[in-house]
Amino acid sequence: TYIFNSKGLCMIEHIPEMIDAGIDSFKIEGRMKTALYVATVARTYRKAIDDYLEDPKKYEANMPWYRDQISNCTYRQFTTGFYFGKPSEESQIYDSNTYIREYTYLGIIGEIKDGLYRIEQRNKFSVGEVIEIMKPDGQNVAVTVKGIYDEEGNSMESAPHAQQKLFIDLGTEIQVYDLLRRAE
């Protein structure tokens, strides 16, 4: 068996069945996951549930967006696990090429000060690079990094050190706790 190489559980396409079954609390797998993964999955499920409760047709119309968001933050293919019976061999991954993530987590906005945004950087990015602001309401806003500054206010061309605390100028308004990511 390939017990440590199973597909990831994903029920985004089955929100109606889960709600109709009386499920009113959803738990995502967050152990050993990045903040980007947890934020993306939680935001996407929240939007899917809200859309379904508002109008099932809206939920169906937005399905491509839900699938895209979930698939862009994971390392694995998906399965419905035991929800609809015993999983088949299709629920396992038998090759080693399972990496499907298409976004890199850059950091989270921790503070706004003098028109700049403080982050604790997680992966390298540079001035002039196009990144995305991932907002809680489901919007993804593409912006160009206008400036990067260390904590003393010195200008930098890039942020090369993981967990480096710095300030960035994105030329647009964003909120504390918005996430930053880069498409790969």
Predicted regions and their residues:
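Surface-exposed amphipathic alpha-helical tracts and adjacent flexible/coil segments at the periphery
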Residues: 1-184
